[in-house]
Structures are given as structure tokens and as C-alpha cells.
């Protein structure tokens, strides 16, 4: 029934298996990839014809993590997988980016690639496996895919590269890098690093490329057994003659338009040239399809003119040299009520970045295959349509916004202080108000300044730059700080961010078959110079982290208590901690190790909660004076609560120096008093005194009461004249015979049974009376 084809290789200490022919057989291509006990299925389907009017390549990639893969049931009301999570969106983009350039120009058939995680062992991450499965499924499907590609994750720990590291190794190490590559060239790089040098980053990419080659060989071996017949693709018509005609008609107009430095003016001039070409097509009697094809040739002509000017004349669209950075203006404390803010402008790209500080309960909860986790640093990137002067959708973030936000997050995450150093939840927002190239790197620069403005003690400021590439044969030009048009018309989008000490993130997308090591090294070196320049401009706005938090930001104070005291602070059913929060107004969080975080925007509230907790966990000291409150009156004295959670007895004789007939005449419940600890017995019961403390000032008074004289007992005589000694056998007492023993019967009436819970109305009973 099944015609199963399978290929296995040893890869990174595990067995990688690619299998087809058993599952999803109606798809054009379907592959199950297995690494360890992690299993991913990717199925590819393609439309057999192109939709009318289609003028772009409609490739859609969906990555989904099934909760059943990790033996979990989804949370929430519906108990099933819902819309894509942030991770699923990011992995979908990770798969899409390296495979999209490998389809031929002019191929507009719709393609779906759906990758589903079916099993997860908690050790081998499924994202890399999904990339491999997608590449293999496309390769055997018969669609015109110029792959295959391989994918690999690389870590860097103790000076050594690690292929497909575990989560623990990534956390301990200095690098998390993902590479996708064909056998001959790197297609995509995505990374986060702890300020690593260009040499280490380049070495990691080359190490990953070697690992990708092994995967590519395995996919080719599978395709030799299971590939379907390749699709026949109609050859594109020779458009040389039409291009020459257009060059004569609008070539000068296009060249003049690309010399305009203002984006809006340039766009208007280009639209006029395109309209002129379209009128010519219609005048020649071309049908709508032919007109559309002609417009595509106009775009090719635009690319040719711009690329030639850069390569031959060294002239960029806005007149800059290849290494020149656009003018930069940075301003901090841009918004008066934000905890931290910055306005960062680079040429025609601008962002308003804000930093908001919160407490632990503001952390983002993430529910994934590994279970629940919490993230205390968030970065949200927003790209409204007005930023490019267009009308469009405004609302929930799309895939692009999620991806750009995560790139900026990776750039800034390595320089954050630890949660012990800075126990705040941090949310950065980057609202792009103008865009003409590299808005994600503007978000990095603006976000770094906003955190510094908020008083977040980051290690060092971070700057970012976007690099471009124009490659024709052996000739190439590397461009620093690319414009949007240079991105669209170029061959590479290479973003690098880092501090003065090293790289924190690197992202590269290649739109051609790949680049050489020489070009990669040159791009890294040129990016380093650009980052240093941008960092210098940022330092003019704010050279160091502000020493004080914003007056509008919450304050957090931490205190460590003995783990044995946690139950005392929380109380039965959380009664004590709820009372602290309700009374003081401060938020109180306590973890299993006894670390307490007290937060509020009011310092007095924090101090009140701190004193309360300190009183609960502190041990009373004999001879020390404390503030207390009367909580219960009894005939023989008063019980006083002090140090927040301790009770002691002030005996009636210790209330005043003079005799007190009735306690209620001089004290009342709820009355604030000052007491001195006289004694703590071995069972922890505390004896207090009020009479030796000035109730107004709390100062200790001299004890003027004379010490009690010991009672004289005199000579008690000889035992012999005191009557018979009482022992176990003699029941007489003082010569009198005792009456009969009273058993359960007799005339005493019914015996009173005592409730296990004690009297119903005892009032406040101190802890030491509950023993």
C-alpha cells in the first residue's frame, strides 16, 4: 500500500531521517523529518495554473506546533490550537526567506508549504527540522525549485562551535545562530550573540554551512528515489527589443528620477515615467496582459539603470558614497510622561521609541511545547501605513512587524541587566513614523536610547545598520545604510547590530544564488565602521544611562528572607500577604527561594510593606523596645501584637508602676503602645512591659519599683510531727479519710464535652496561646 522512501544520516550526534510515501500522499510533496524523537511533517501543494492578473509569486508558509507533540492539552476555553503564536510566525518566516529566492523569475503559481510538529522530545528543536522538511518536500514535488537547501543551528560555548545545541547550551553559551544554505552558498542568517567579534561570527556561519551541505546531500539522495516529474515552465519571451524601446522612451526620465534625493519627489517622477510607458503600450494596441508584462520590463529597466550607476559611477540614489551614512538626529526624553523615550531620525527613516517599566505581574506568559514560561523583556514594532505615505490596513501586527520586532529584540536582549540586578519587566515600543530603509535598525538605536533614558542599566549602547549589495558577475558594491529602493533593487539585505565591543545580532537575506566569503567579510568590516559612526551620533543625545528612574515609573525593592519564614509572610490561604497589600497599597511578590519584591510608585508604601514583612520575619530581642498594638484584653493583662506578626503578654503588673485594678480602665483594643521585651521562654512565648517605656517618646525609663523581697519560710520542723506521709498506698489527707472516687456516674450531672475548635468567641488569640 505504501511506497516508502527513506534516507538517514548521522548529523550533530543524532540520526536525521527523511521519509516520504507514507503520509500526505495527495500533496505534491510531503516529507516527514525526524531528529531524535522530534518529528515534523511538511506538505507542499502548488496550483497548476496562474490566477488572472497575478503579477507576484504567492508563496505561503505555515508552521504549526501541535500541543500533542509534547503530550500537552492547549490552555484556554476551546482546548485546541488557535491562531499562530509569535514563535510560529517567526519560524514560518524562517522557512520562507531562504526558499523564496530559489524559484524562477516569472513563476506566479500559488504554493502552500505547511509544516506541523508531530512529536517533540524537548531536546531537538523543531524549527530547524521544519526548514529541512520544507526543502525536501519542495525538492521532490516537481515544482521549479532551484534547491535544495539545508539548515543548521550553531552555538558557541567555551570557544567552540556546537551544531544543533540544546536550549541549555544556548543559554550558557554566547551565540544562537541559524543558517540556511545551498551546497554552494549561504542564503540566510539569523542570530543573537553576546557581543562577539566579526571573526567569530564569520566562523560560525562557515561552520553552519558545512553542516548544511550534509543535509543537502541527504535531500538529493531522497529526490533520486522519490522525486516527481519536473514541471514544464514556459520560457520567457525575449524582451530585449522592448527594453531598448523603453530605454529610448523613458530611460532619461528614470535616471533623472533616481537622482532626486527626496523620496516623495522621486516616487512621483517614477510614476510619471511608468504612466508614459503604459500610454505607449496602449497606443501600440497591446492587450492588458501584454501591458502588464511591459510594466514588469519597466521595473527591470529601473533596476538596470540604478545598479549600473552604482557599479560604474559609484553614485547612489541619494548621491551618497557607498560607505556614507545618512544624517542622524537623536533626542531623548521626547515624551514627558513615558518612563523613557527617544526620537531617532536617520535620513527619511524615523521612530518614536518608548520604554515602560513594570512589575513581575506584567511579564508576558508564553504557552508552548516546553510548557508555560514568562518573558520580562518585550519589544513591539509598529509600522503604520502613513510612515510611507500610503493608505492601508492599520491594526493587529502582521508577520513583517513581528519579525522586525524580534530582530530588534535580539539586538538589545544581550545587553540587558539580569533580573537580580534590575527586577523590572521592560516593554519597548518602536512606532515607525517615517520609513525609507532599515526601520528595524532604527528601532534598535531608538530602543537603546529609550532604555537608557528610563534608567535601565544596560551594559553598553547598541547601534544597528542595514547593508546592501549590488553584484554583477565579478563586480560588486557594498552599500552602507541602504534606502528602501536600494533594498528592493539590490541583491542582499544584511543587518548588523552591536555595541562597541562586538555584534549582538546579525540577519542576512540573499536574493541571488549566494555570496562568497570575500564579500561576506567585506560587508562585516564595512558594517562595523558604520555602527561605530552611528553609535557616536547616539552618544551625543545621551552618553550614559540615567542614574534615576522616571518619577512616573514604579519602584521595586527586594529583600531576602529565610525560606522557613515564607509561610509566615504568606499566611494561611494567603491571608497575611493579602492584608499587607491591602493595607499598604504596595505589590508584594515572593518566590520559592525567599526573594521578596515590593513594588509601588509611592516609596512610603514600599517602606510600610518592607517594615511589616521585616517585623514578621525578624526575631524579637530581649531588652529591645518595639511599637505594638493591643489586640486582646484579659483579666490578668493585655496581649500586644508587635513586629507585625508577633504577640506578647503585658501582665497587669507591667502596665503601670501603680496598681491597676481593671485592665480595661487603662487600655483598649486597637490602642497603640510601646513595649519592652522582658523575656522569651524556650517555647517562644514573650513577656512584655509597658511601665518601663515612655509611651510618648518610646524611651526606656528607669525601673523605680523595688524588687520583690523573697518570702521567709522559717523552720518547717521535722517530718515526723507532720502526720503520716502521703504515698501511693495511703489515701488519707491530714488524718481524714477521702471519700469515694467520683467516676463517670455520681451526682455531678452530665459531663461537658469540649469542642475541638475551642470556644466559639475567643477574640484575637495570640500565636503562643495556640500551642
Curated annotation (Swiss-Prot):
The protein's Enzyme Commission number: 2.7.7.8
Domain S1 motif: 623-691
GO terms, molecular function: 3'-5'-RNA exonuclease activity; magnesium ion binding; polyribonucleotide nucleotidyltransferase activity; RNA binding
Domain of life: Bacteria
All residue ranges annotated as the KH domain in the record: 554-613
SUPFAM superfamilies assigned: Eukaryotic type KH-domain (KH-domain type I), Nucleic acid-binding proteins, Polynucleotide phosphorylase/guanosine pentaphosphate synthase (PNPase/GPSI), domain 3, Ribonuclease PH domain 2-like, Ribosomal protein S5 domain 2-like
Binding site for Mg(2+): 487, 493
Catalytic reaction(s) noted: RNA(n+1) + phosphate = RNA(n) + a ribonucleoside 5'-diphosphate
CC annotations in GO: cytosol
Enzyme class: transferase
Region of interest (Disordered), ranges: 696-771
GO biological process: mRNA catabolic process; RNA processing
Regions of compositional bias (Basic and acidic residues) in chain numbering: 702-771
Cofactors, names only: Mg(2+)
Location(s), subcellular: Cytoplasm
Entry keyword set: Cytoplasm, Magnesium, Metal-binding, Nucleotidyltransferase, RNA-binding, Transferase
Function: Involved in mRNA degradation. Catalyzes the phosphorolysis of single-stranded polyribonucleotides processively in the 3'- to 5'-direction.
NCBIfam families attached to this UniProt entry: polynuc_phos (TIGR03591), PRK11824.1 (NF008805)
Cited PANTHER family: POLYRIBONUCLEOTIDE NUCLEOTIDYLTRANSFERASE, POLYRIBONUCLEOTIDE NUCLEOTIDYLTRANSFERASE 1, MITOCHONDRIAL
Similarity comment: family membership: Belongs to the polyribonucleotide nucleotidyltransferase family.
Name of this chain's protein: Polyribonucleotide nucleotidyltransferase
Amino acid at each position: 500500500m505504501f511506497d516508502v522512501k527513506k534516507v538517514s544520516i548521522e548529523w550533530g550526534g543524532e540520526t536525521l531521517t527523511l521519509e516520504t510515501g507514507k503520509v500526505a500522499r495527495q500533496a505534491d510533496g510531503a516529507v516527514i523529518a525526524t531528529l531524535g524523537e522530534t518529528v515534523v511533517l511538511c506538505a507542499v501543494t502548488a496550483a497548476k495554473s496562474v490566477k488572472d492578473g497575478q503579477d507576484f509569486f504567492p508563496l505561503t508558509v505555515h508552521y504549526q506546533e501541535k500541543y500533542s507533540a509534547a503530550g500537552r492539552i492547549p490552555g484556554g476555553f476551546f482546548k485546541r490550537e488557535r491562531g499562530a503564536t509569535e514563535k510560529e510566525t517567526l519560524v514560518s518566516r524562517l522557512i520562507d526567506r531562504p526558499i523564496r529566492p530559489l524559484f524562477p523569475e516569472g513563476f506566479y503559481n500559488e504554493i502552500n508549504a505547511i509544516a506541523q510538529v508531530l512529536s517533540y522530545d524537548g531536546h531537538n528543536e523543531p524549527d530547524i527540522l521544519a526548514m529541512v522538511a520544507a526543502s525536501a518536500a519542495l525538492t521532490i514535488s516537481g515544482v521549479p525549485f532551484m534547491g535544495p537547501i539545508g539548515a543548521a543551528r550553531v552555538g558557541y560555548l567555551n570557544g567552540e562551535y556546537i551544531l544543533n545545541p540544546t536550549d541549555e547550551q544556548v543559554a550558557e553559551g554566547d551565540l544562537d545562530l541559524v543558517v540556511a544554505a545551498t551546497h554552494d552558498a549561504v542564503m540566510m542568517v539569523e542570530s543573537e550573540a553576546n557581543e562577539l567579534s566579526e571573526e567569530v561570527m564569520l566562523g560560525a556561519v562557515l561552520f553552519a554551512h558545512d553542516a548544511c551541505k550534509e543535509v543537502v546531500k541527504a535531500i538529493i539522495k531522497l529526490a533520486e528515489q522519490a522525486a516527481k516529474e519536473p514541471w514544464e515552465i514556459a520560457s520567457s519571451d525575449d524582451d530585449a527589443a522592448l527594453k531598448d524601446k523603453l530605454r529610448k522612451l523613458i530611460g532619461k526620465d528614470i535616471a533623472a528620477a533616481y537622482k532626486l534625493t527626496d523620496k516623495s519627489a522621486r516616487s512621483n517622477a517614477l510614476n510619471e515615467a511608468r504612466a508614459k510607458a503604459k500610454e505607449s503600450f496602449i497606443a501600440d494596441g497591446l492587450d492588458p496582459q501584454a501591458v502588464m508584462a511591459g510594466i514588469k520590463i519597466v521595473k527591470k529597466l529601473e533596476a538596470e539603470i540604478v545598479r549600473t550607476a552604482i557599479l560604474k559611477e559609484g553614485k547612489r540614489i541619494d548621491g551618497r558614497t557607498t560607505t556614507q551614512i545618512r544624517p542622524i538626529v537623536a533626542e531623548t526624553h521626547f515624551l514627558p510622561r513615558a518612563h523613557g523615550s527617544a526620537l531617532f531620525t536617520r535620513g527619511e527613516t524615523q521612530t518614536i521609541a518608548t520604554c515602560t517599566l513594570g512589575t513581575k505581574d506584567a511579564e508576558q506568559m508564553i504557552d508552548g511545547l516546553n510548557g508555560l514560561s514568562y518573558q520580562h523583556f518585550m519589544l513591539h514594532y509598529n509600522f503604520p501605513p502613513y510612515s510611507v505615505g500610503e493608505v492601508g490596513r492599520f491594526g493587529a501586527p502582521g508577520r513583517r512587524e513581528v519579525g522586525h520586532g524580534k530582530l530588534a529584540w535580539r539586538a538589545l536582549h544581550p545587553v540587558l541587566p539580569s533580573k537580580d540586578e534590575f527586577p523590572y519587566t521592560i516593554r519597548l515600543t518602536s512606532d515607525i513614523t517615517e520609513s525609507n530603509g532599515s526601520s528595524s535598525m532604527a528601532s534598535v538605536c531608538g530602543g537603546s536610547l529609550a532604555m537608557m533614558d528610563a534608567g535601565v542599566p544596560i551594559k553598553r549602547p547598541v547601534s544597528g545598520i542595514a547593508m546592501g549589495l549590488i553584484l554583477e558577475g565579478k563586480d560588486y558594491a557594498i552599500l552602507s545604510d541602504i534606502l528602501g529602493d536600494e533594498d528592493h533593487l539590490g541583491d542582499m539585505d544584511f543587518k548588523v547590530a552591536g555595541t562597541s565591543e562586538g555584534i549582538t545580532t546579525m540577519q542576512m537575506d540573499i536574493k541571488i544564488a549566494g555570496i562568497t566569503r570575500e564579500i561576506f567579510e567585506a560587508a562585516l568590516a564595512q558594517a562595523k565602521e558604520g555602527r561605530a559612526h552611528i553609535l557616536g551620533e547616539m552618544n551625543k543625545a545621551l552618553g550614559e544611562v540615567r542614574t534615576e528612574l522616571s518619577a512616573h515609573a514604579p519602584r521595586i525593592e527586594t529583600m531576602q528572607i529565610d525560606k522557613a519564614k515564607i509561610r509566615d509572610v504568606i499566611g494561611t490561604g494567603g491571608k497575611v500577604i493579602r492584608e499587607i497589600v491591602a493595607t499598604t497599597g504596595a505589590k508584594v511578590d515572593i518566590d520559592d527561594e525567599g526573594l521578596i519584591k515590593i513594588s509601588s510608585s509611592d516609596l512610603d508604601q514600599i517602606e510600610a510593606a518592607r517594615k511589616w514583612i521585616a517585623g514578621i520575619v525578624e526575631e524579637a530581642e530581649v531588652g529591645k523596645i518595639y511599637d505594638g498594638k493591643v489586640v486582646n484584653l484579659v483579666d490578668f493583662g493585655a496581649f500586644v501584637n508587635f513586629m507585625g506578626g508577633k504577640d506578647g503578654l503585658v501582665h497587669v503588673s507591667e502596665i503601670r508602676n501603680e496598681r491597676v485594678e481593671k485592665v480595661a480602665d487603662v487600655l483598649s483594643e486597637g490602642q497603640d503602645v510601646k513595649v519592652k521585651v522582658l523575656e522569651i521562654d524556650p517555647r517562644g512565648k514573650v513577656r512584655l512591659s509597658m511601665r518601663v517605656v515612655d509611651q510618648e517618646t518610646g524611651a526606656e525609663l528607669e525601673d523605680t519599683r523595688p524588687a520583690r523581697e523573697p518570702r521567709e519560710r522559717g523552720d518547717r520542723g521535722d517530718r515526723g510531727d507532720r502526720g503520716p506521709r502521703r504515698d501511693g498506698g495511703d489515701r488519707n489527707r491530714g488524718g481524714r479519710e477521702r471519700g469515694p472516687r467520683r467516676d463517670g456516674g455520681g451526682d455531678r450531672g452530665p459531663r461537658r464535652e469540649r469542642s475541638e475548635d475551642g470556644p466559639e468567641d475567643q477574640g484575637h488569640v495570640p500565636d503562643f496561646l495556640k500551642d
